[in-house]
Amino acid sequence: YGQAIQTLYEKNRRYDSSNQIPMLPISLFKTEELKSIPDSEIFKVITSSGTSGVASHLYLDAFNAQNQQLALYTIVKDFIGSSRLPMLIVDTPDILKNRDAFNARGAAILGFSIFAKRKYYALKPDLSVDLESIRTFIQTYRNQPVLIFGFTFMIWQYLCEALANYPGLIDLSNAILIHGGGWKKMQDRAVSPHEYKKRLY
């Protein structure tokens, strides 16, 4: 960060407060390999979903990768508690099998899997809705809290829109939904955050 500030802005300037420190354009993570560690210490590369056309890459060493996982656990447990819950993942299990195509969706599924007592997938390999898997999930855990996880646009396109054709199939009033990423695709579909929440309720 310091090197970037020195390159882009006035060199050797002293800042008296954090309000004076310049911001960096987030697009730099898409166009440059920004690293604060040597290549030999790279433990994990986080890749964004790239819904805007170009993916960002963040390079972590083992220490910061562990801290990232601990931070995720600390934040999420405030919402769902410390117990693991049955989880319905709005994606296909195949996304974890092809390491060459591994992306932000796969990384997010792996990250949030620490909260799952048992995992079910809502989609088949061809991204069609797996009704049998969803029915099994609902019937098995009808009277207890459950967790649903997926990317924002995946939940909209493959769960909300598809299951609208099967009214009465799902009762997810006992579910906690966690979604993230993919808002660019929602904007392309002219779906506002308000409309998204309204459909889910």
Feature annotation, model-predicted:
Residues 44, 83-88, 118-119, 144-146:
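Generic beta-strand structural signal
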Residues 49-101, 112-113:
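Conserved adenylate-forming
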Residues 65, 106, 165-167:
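Glycine-rich, phosphate-binding/catalytic loops in enzymes
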Residues 2-45, 56-58, 69, 74-80:
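Active-site diphosphate/adenylate-binding microenvironment
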Residues 110-201:
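Active-site glycine/GP-rich loop and adjacent strand/helix microenvironment
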Residues 3-4, 95-102, 186-187:
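Short, charged/polar "capping" segments at the starts of alpha-helices
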Residues 47-55, 152, 181:
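Ser/Thr-glycine-rich phosphate-binding loops at phosphate-binding pockets of nucleotides
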